[in-house]
Amino acid sequence: MKKMVQIKYKEVKTKRVNDYETTFKIEPLERGFGSTIGTALRRTLLSSITSVVPFAIKIKDVDQEFDTISDIVEDVQMIMLNVKNIHLVYDENIFEDNKIYRGVIETKNEKITSSDLKFPENPEIEIVNKDLEIATNNGQKPFVMEVYFHVGRGYISFEDNKKLIEEKVALLNSTIKRGKFLAIDSDFSPVEKVKVKVQEINSSSLNIEEELEIEIKTKGTIDTKNILSQAAQILIAHLQVIGDVKNLDAVDVFEQKKQEKVEPSIHSVDITSLDLSVRSINALKRQGYTKLADILTLTEDDLVAVKNLGKKSVEEIIQKLKEYNVTLNRGEK
């Protein structure tokens, strides 16, 4: 295989805003590779990066999303919309797959924001947008709400999250006695914007070469270097399956395929499983025929010649073999 020019990957310092908004450059790429790589990375960045988001809430004395709450300006639906925008710093050392994380708001503050959200079981969890307004309390009673988070990627509708609540209700550990769990949509994408730019570059090469610029802005939950690395790893994992043709079983980045039950071969079936008469079974066993595979070596003439097998017994055996879609040769004419 003809070798390609070694490429370089770097951050464009002049276009850097912070860890969560910057631009990366890859060059030199052979003609066409800029668009190919850029499009694949962009789609993966927008759809397949892991993060942690809310999937359910529980408000004291609230049973459905159409309720209103005494002294609270916002209705329940508006509160749910606000909660969806709570962003947590995603740290793989803190958050585990298939685990539920409970946040609690209990305050008499007039302006209730995401900074009022506390994690009793996981105090190390950090909130990105602490000034996000959740609700307005015009009364003296405390506003009490629990928010439940989990790890995932892509998008999950509130209907699917309803099912998740039913499955995980025992793990939610709610301390609110009056009120019901309400599901909300989960948009896991930590990316706000991805812009891909491809242009030709002047070089000493005789071939036309390109540079690829990828501008990324996240929601502040994961830094841009990490999500770009994660996107590349996802693509590599898929392409490795194609490239590593001789060692497909060694690729373990995908979920394990459920093992299908393998039916035993009919050749290994014991003759006692054929539901034959005792006379027929004994006659066959005396001649050393204990498996269906043994019988399949015989012709009909051989079967007739077996000692103590009468005409009816032979017909019985032939009929049973037909149930296994097996027929014996008739023998020499």
Swiss-Prot record:
Query: Which GO MF terms does the UniProt record name?
Result: DNA binding; DNA-directed RNA polymerase activity; protein dimerization activity
Gene Ontology cellular-component terms listed: cytoplasm; DNA-directed RNA polymerase complex
Which reactions fall under this protein's catalytic activity?
RNA(n) + a ribonucleoside 5'-triphosphate = RNA(n+1) + diphosphate
Q: Which CDD domains match?
A: RNAP_alpha_NTD (cd06928)
Top-level division of the source organism's lineage: Bacteria
Q: Does the keyword Flavoprotein apply?
A: no
The keyword ATP-binding appears for this protein: no
Q: Which UniProt keywords apply?
A: DNA-directed RNA polymerase, Nucleotidyltransferase, Transcription, Transferase
Q: What is known of its domains?
A: The N-terminal domain is essential for RNAP assembly and basal transcription, whereas the C-terminal domain is involved in interaction with transcriptional regulators and with upstream promoter elements.
Q: Which proteins does it associate with, and in what oligomeric form?
A: Homodimer. The RNAP catalytic core consists of 2 alpha, 1 beta, 1 beta' and 1 omega subunit. When a sigma factor is associated with the core the holoenzyme is formed, which can initiate transcription.
Protein name stated in the entry: DNA-directed RNA polymerase subunit alpha
Q: Which organism is it from?
A: Mycoplasmopsis pulmonis (strain UAB CTIP)
Gene that this polypeptide is encoded by: rpoA
